[in-house]
């Protein structure tokens, strides 16, 4: 219930800053070759393929994975898991699966949001420091980023969600 919406502020900040830094460092290198117009391509592809999913994965591992481990560990100490077994409930189905499903659903959504925030950070640098127009930046981004690139990042985020939920729940048990 708290794994998704409560993560938006930190995902927003981190992704915006990653896009900002990616654009700034990339623009400095691209300007050596007179290729600043490819700045939107760099940020768009970098965020959608790799950085968006990676940043969300790191944030959610630290935030949600540790929360899952602590919650389930507390349940274990209080013998709540033994009580579930006694009542005939399988702890994996009752405790682990809902948490895993939550992260499988939330991670791709957070990844898409992180991609957008990173591109927004890149746009801030491109428009503010390197005299690239807003229209030119977003048109170049649209031309560079394909649906396949977005799907690659979303798929990675889903896999990260499974791994984070599984490792957090298993550590708690």
Predicted regions and their residues:
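Short hydrophobic/aromatic-rich motifs at helix boundaries and adjacent loops
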Residues: 15-16, 51-55, 93, 139
């Amino acid at each position: 219930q708290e794994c998704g919406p409560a993560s938006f502020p930190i995902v927003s900040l981190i992704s915006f800053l990653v896009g900002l830094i990616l654009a700034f460092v990339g623009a400095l290198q691209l300007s050596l070759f007179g290729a600043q117009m490819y700045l939107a391509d760099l940020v768009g592809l970098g965020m959608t393929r790799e950085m968006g999913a990676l940043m969300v994965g790191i944030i959610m591992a630290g935030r949600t994975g540790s929360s899952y481990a602590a919650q389930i560990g507390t349940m274990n100490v209080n013998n709540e898991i033994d009580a579930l077994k006694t009542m005939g409930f399988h702890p994996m189905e009752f405790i682990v699966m809902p948490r895993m499903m939550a992260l499988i659903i939330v991670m791709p959504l957070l990844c898409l949001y992180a991609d957008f925030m990173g591109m927004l950070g890149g746009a801030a640098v491109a428009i503010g420091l390197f005299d690239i127009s807003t229209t030119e930046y977003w048109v170049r981004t649209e031309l560079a980023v394909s649906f396949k690139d977005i799907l690659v990042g979303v798929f990675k985020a889903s896999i990260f969600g499974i791994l984070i939920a599984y490792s957090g729940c298993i550590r708690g048990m």
